[in-house]
Regions:
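Residues that flank catalytic or metal-binding motifs in active/ligand-binding sites
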Residues: 15-17, 46-48, 82, 115, ...
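Active-site segment of metal-dependent pyrophosphate-handling enzymes
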Residues: 67-70, 103-141
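Short, contiguous pre-domain boundary segments
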Residues: 2-4
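Acyl-donor binding region in acyl/amide transferases
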Residues: 85-93
Length: 141
């Protein structure tokens, strides 16, 4: 049984959702639809990956999540705490705070978050889907 959503189902769900197209230096080039950004070889777009951790004694525990079936790319995979494709006008840290609350119910203050680095990658999935992102890695406790 294939639980993965069809292109038509995803297009209906994300029809109005836009992402920010960028070059390799995070300069804005415009916007495009979320589905367009993830089909075939994808369109380079702005994203963040948030990794939350907590100290337990002398060890750090990472908060992971399993990606939802509604995700166009890599549904059901285990991943970082939260990741997201930014829409036009959204800023990295404020959107990371609001998105982790929406997705995980976790309340985080922006002051505990740090932007570590950005990297660009392209990772094809099965069935014609692809992540093609300039990803800002954010960590917090």
């Amino acid at each position: 049984m294939n639980l993965r959503k069809t292109v038509e189902e995803l297009d209906q769900k994300y029809h109005d959702r836009k992402v920010v197209m960028v070059d390799g230096n995070d300069n804005e080039l415009g916007s495009c639809g979320l589905i367009e950004a993830h089909r075939d070889s994808g369109v380079k777009h702005r994203a963040f990956s948030l990794q939350l951790y907590r100290l337990v004694g002398d060890k750090k525990e990472l908060l992971l999540q399993q990606r939802a079936v509604e995700k166009p790319v890599f549904p059901f995979y285990w991943a970082n705490t939260c990741c997201y494709n930014l829409a036009p006008g959204e800023m990295y840290l404020p959107r990371a705070v609001s998105r982790v609350k929406e997705e995980m119910g976790v309340v985080v203050d922006e002051s505990v978050l740090r932007e570590l680095y950005k990297f660009s990658y392209c990772s094809p999935d099965i069935e014609g889907w692809c992540e093609n992102e300039l990803d800002n890695v954010i960590v917090g406790e």
